[in-house]
Amino acid sequence: MKNGGGKSMQVKDRLIYKEIKFQAAPFSYDLKFFARITLVRGYSATGKTYLYNLFSDLRLTKEFNKIVLFNYKTDNFVSELRKVKNSFVVIDNGDILIDDKIKAHINFDKSNQYLLFLRNCDGLNLSQDSFTVLHKSDNHITIEKEFKL
């Protein structure tokens, strides 16, 4: 996997990463974020969990060491999530893990940026910029806004 760069912003701007670019052959990824909470929605088998797995390698680099991952295999999910500060939190299988208490935590936790692989967004404070889908064009993967005005 080859890093192409990550543009970080200060926490006061509420985005830990504004952009994450990298290559994982045969694909190149250019992921741009416009909101503190980003939902990646879509049907099964569209690459969401694959992207989550790529983040597990990417977070080992100096450039992307603020990435923290959670999924259904995470022990003590609730207590571990509450400990995380100033990070880019990625949660896979959010429909299984995220209940109303976690949604409230995410809403009021201004120190972290969240990337959620989640279908049910009821209870989250979101903007239209929060709703995204993975988009593939040739071997280039991006996150596109779901609602374009």
Name what the model sees in each region.
Residues L126-L149:
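A short helix-turn-beta junction within AAA+ P-loop NTPase domains corresponding to the substrate/partner-engaging
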Residues D30-A35:
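Phosphate-binding P-loop
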Residues K2-Y29:
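N-terminal pre-Walker A segment at the start of P-loop NTPase domains
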Residues V40-G42:
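Hydrophobic anchor at the beta1->P-loop junction of P-loop NTPases
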Residues T46-K48:
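Conserved glycine(s) of the Walker
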Residues K73-G123:
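Conserved nucleotide-sensing/catalytic segment adjacent to the nucleotide-binding pocket
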Residues D57-I67:
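Post-Walker A helix-loop "phosphate-sensing" segment adjacent to the P-loop in P-loop NTPases
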Residues L51-Y52:
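Post-Walker A alpha-helix
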